[in-house]
């Protein structure tokens, strides 16, 4: 047996490989910690120098630095600017609790005094005049963001009918009452606006009628005055006739072209309104043929005579009507006879969507033809029903006869052949009579 040191087998021996590795690891960690601490102390020293330089610049009249979020990184002084040595004591582990308890009152007094000194030295707070900074502060305001989220949630809930109904029910408000109230307000607003529009149209029509009546009276008075002056000029000398003509020319020159155009436009509009009302009332009162024949009555002739005299005096629509008639004469005529030879049924409606008026004879013929077609369709349907019933009866009779024959065959089999035993004996006898070729072919 060889000799050896038994202490090498102990777990506490420093030369064991495990203990050596643990020692090296602990030493490396201590060295890394000292390096980090030294680096942090250098950073603190650099920050302190920068602060001193900034304070010196501010004291010399330089630009003041605005503190925004620096208070978050000011250190373990509860938001107060304490001593730098006290700040570094946390890192070095040299800060003692007994000293803090003893100097608590003194620190409070010093902190209040330092706050007052800082406020008095700083003066008024700097005013932020940059619009971008103001917009950024408003956009990043947490309270504003919370309010905006609440508003969005409320709008989403009001847009959802189920949640809206639940909210109104919790508040004790009926949704149907709100909807009915809104519908009443909308109908009242529409009714009020309709009344306003009808009143405006009525006032405009009344003004137009008054203007047209005033123009008619002026035209009648001017015609009467011209006729009187013409009668007087016949009985007077040629000199007086020339004087009257000069007066009439002056009177005509006195009427401005704008007034003449306005009078012609009002007259044509009033005549169009009267003609349209007369045509509408005539269509409601009489058929198409009778209303067309009534236009040749003496009253119609007298009204046309009055309109012709008025148009001749005004000199407006007659020339336009002549031009329109000349254009209609030059336009090629449609051959309605060829169109009648090829009738097309459009459901009784013309291009305007109104039902065309047919003569009584054609209407009666169409009704008779429709009645004949309906009778033929009903007769064909009746014949089809009868044929179907007969076919169903024949099928039922055939099924009944087949059931009776089957029942009769069963009764005979039971009576003469003994039922199932007779059936099996018949099968055996038939199998015995079969040849081998029939058996090979599978015949029974």
From Swiss-Prot:
Any one GO CC term of the record: U2-type spliceosomal complex
Coiled-coil parts of chain: 19-65, 364-417
Entry superkingdom: Eukaryota
Region (Disordered): 1-27, 168-385, 397-425
Cellular compartments annotated: Nucleus
InterPro entries for this protein: CIR_N_dom (IPR019339), CWC25 (IPR022209), CWC25_splicing_factor (IPR051376)
Biased composition (Basic and acidic residues): 200-220, 228-281, 305-344, 360-372, 397-410
Keyword field: Coiled coil, mRNA processing, mRNA splicing, Nucleus, Spliceosome
Residue ranges with Basic residues bias: 186-199, 282-293
Pfam family, one: Cir_N
Signal sequence, start to end: none
Keyword Coiled coil assigned: yes
GO biological process terms on file: mRNA splicing, via spliceosome
Function: Involved in pre-mRNA splicing.
Family of this protein: Belongs to the CWC25 family.
Subunit relationships: Associated with the spliceosome.
Name the record gives this protein: Pre-mRNA-splicing factor cwc25
